[in-house]
Amino acid sequence: MDGYEGSNARVHEVTTLVNGVARSLPATMSLLSALRSELGLTGVKPGCGEGACGSCTVLVDGEPEHACRRRVCDVEGHDVTTIESLACTGTLHRVQQAFVEIGAAQCGYCTPGMVLSVLALLARIPNPDDAAIDEALNGNVCRCGTYPRIRRAVHRAVELGAQSGTEAMDATAAADRWALGDPQSPPPRPSRPWDMTEPEDRDWFEVLGDGLVVVLPALPLAPGSWSTGASAWLHVDADAKVTAFTGKVDVGQDNCTALRLLVAEELRVPLANVRLAMGDTDLCPYDMGTFGSRSMPDAGHALAQVAAHARTVLPVGAGLRRVEIITGAPVVMAGTEWRQAGTGHVPEGMVDAVTGARRFASDLTLPGLRYGAVLRPHVLGATLRELDAGALSD
C-alpha cells in the first residue's frame, strides 16, 4: 500500500518533472507513493508491489516503468508522465478513445497502465502487429482477461491516427450520470436496512426526497433454489430523475448501462436521467459491485416491470409522496418500441477508466486516515526488536 515509507521520508527532496511540471518530492519515497499520496495522481494504481502486474505503469522519458519499483531519486531530473496528463485538454487521446470505442476496459483497474504502455508502443512502432502488441504489453496484467479487445483497441488507435478530421471524444468523466455523493459527505442513508424492512415501512422520502416509489417485492425463495432476483424498486422525482435498485450489478460488462436503458425506455426519459443504486456494497465508497454475469437475467425483467408500472401512474407532481407496491404482472414494452437502445451509448464509466478518474476503495482518502503495510526484514530470520507506534496514538 502506498504512503508507508515512514516519518523520515521527507528528510531529503529531489526535483523531477511530473506531467510537465517540476515537483519536489521525498527522495527515498517510492515513485508510486509519491505520485498518489503527495500529488493525488490516483490513476497510478497499486497492485502487486513487485513490478509484475503493471497497474502502476507510468512513462519515464517516454518509456514504460513500474512506479512501485522506482524511488523518487531514481527519476530525479527525468520526465514522468501519468494517465492524468493525456486528456488534460478536455478531449481523449486517440489511444484512450480507441479503448472506449472498442470497450477494451472491464473493471478498469489495469487500464491506465495499459493505455500508457500502448502510447509508448505506438511512439516506437506506429503500426504494430499482434506479436508486437503482445510483447509491449507483456508487463501489464489484465485480471479480467480483455486481451483480444485490447489488441483491437491498439489497431483502432492506429486507424484514428491515420484519419484526418476525426472528432476527438469528450473526456468529461461520468458525463451521462449525476453523482451519488462524495464519500466525505455521503448522501442520506436509511435508518434501517431496507432489505430488512417491509416496503411500506421504509423511509423512502427521507433518503430519496419527494416523488413516486414503485416496488416489486421479492418472491418467496424455496429452500435450495436459485434466486430469481425478482425484486426491484425505483423512485421518480418531480424533475423526472430516476433512481432504480436491482441488487448488485456487474462492472465492466456494461450491464449497468443496459439496466439503465430498460428503465429509460419504459419511462421514456433520457438515459442520463437514470442512475442505479447497487445493493449493500453501495455503502462502501468507490465499490465496484459484483463481478458475475447474471445481473441482466436475474434483475432485468423485474426492473422493467417496476418501470412499466411507474409509467402507468405518472406524471409525478412536485411534493408528491406516493408508494406503489406491485401485486400483478405489469406488461413491459416490446423491444420494437425502444428508441434509445442500440444508438451508441458510451458504456457506463468507460471514460473514467481510460482517464484514470475511476476510483476504487484503495483510492479513498479521509482526514486522519492511517495506512498499514507489511514490512519485510532485510535479512532472513530477522526478529522485530522495537516498534515505534507513537504516531498511531496521536
Region locations from a protein language model:
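Cofactor-binding beta-sheet edge motifs in enzyme active sites
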Residues: 2-17, 22-29, 42, 48, ...
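Flexible glycine-/small-residue-rich
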Residues: 18, 60, 82-84
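Glycine-rich phosphate/pyrophosphate-binding loop shared by adenosine-nucleotide-utilizing enzymes
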Residues: 65
